[in-house]
Amino acid sequence: MENILEYNNWEDKLWALYNSIFKDASYTITDGVIFPDKYASTPFKVMIMNREAYDEKSYSLNQDGIAKEIGEGIIPFKDQITLRSHLRQYLSLIHLLSNKGFNEVSEKEVIDFVNQSDNDDLVYYLSNAAYINIKKSDGKKRSVRSDLKEYAKKGIEVLKEQIRFCNPSVILGGDVCYNIIDNLFDWGEELYGGDGYNPVKIYELVIDGKSYPFIDMFHPSRTQNYKDGDEKESMSMYFLELFKAMISVEKTRPGYWSSHMNNKCFETSALK
């Protein structure tokens, strides 16, 4: 209950800031932590950062939206099959890796675990996560990078505050980095895939001197094949690229992911 009260009090301040910046928005879809108590108690905290909420009815991304749907037995993103399927895969993988300490997991074990997951598992994983969009109002069904970047630049303090207060163990960025937020945040070390093309890259995003692991991925709604070297691969197997990337970081920096487990959240804020 204490976590819920802390989060609610902070959220009131956050959206007051947002509304003071985007005064002319025709609608706003608030986002963030879905269940504050569950997020606070989960050892490895995942924040999903996607582009924009283009449909006021399809997206409702915090405890006032998805949480109510889950409580009523409604499947989140029920009309967005690709988004739902890929999020389930990525969150299933991270759940498995964090439970195993990010080592001693075979590719076969990953494939079996991810493929047997279902909508009930998605509900469980989302219930422990945070979900935010770069653009929270007046979205477009077809994203335009210049529009998203302009919006992100204007609302950068809102995004920073959401990350700062939620203190995630990892941020899954759905194609929001290149030419959108890449020049708006400070960045630390490139942990994986920084040289040339790679279907997954891992950086450290820096706010107030604190580093947050940031995974630069394709958007979970993507349906086209992707390149892995000279080969084209189906997005249905893209979760293996995420697996390869996270394990590579762990091998080169033993204990890296474990050092981001059990983060304290809902404590650090720049809002008065």
Residues of each region from the PLM?
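Active-site flanking residues adjacent to catalytic metal/cofactor-binding acidic residues
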Residues: 132, 174, 218
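C-terminal capping/extension of enzyme domains
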Residues: 2-9, 146-160, 179-272
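Hydrophobic beta-strand segments of well-ordered beta-sheets in folded domains
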Residues: 46, 169-171, 213-214
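A polyanion-binding, active-site-adjacent surface
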Residues: 2-166
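Glycine-rich anion-binding loop/nest that anchors nucleotide
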Residues: 50, 169-178
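Catalytic metal-binding/acid-base residues of hydrolase active sites
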Residues: 53, 135, 176-178, 221
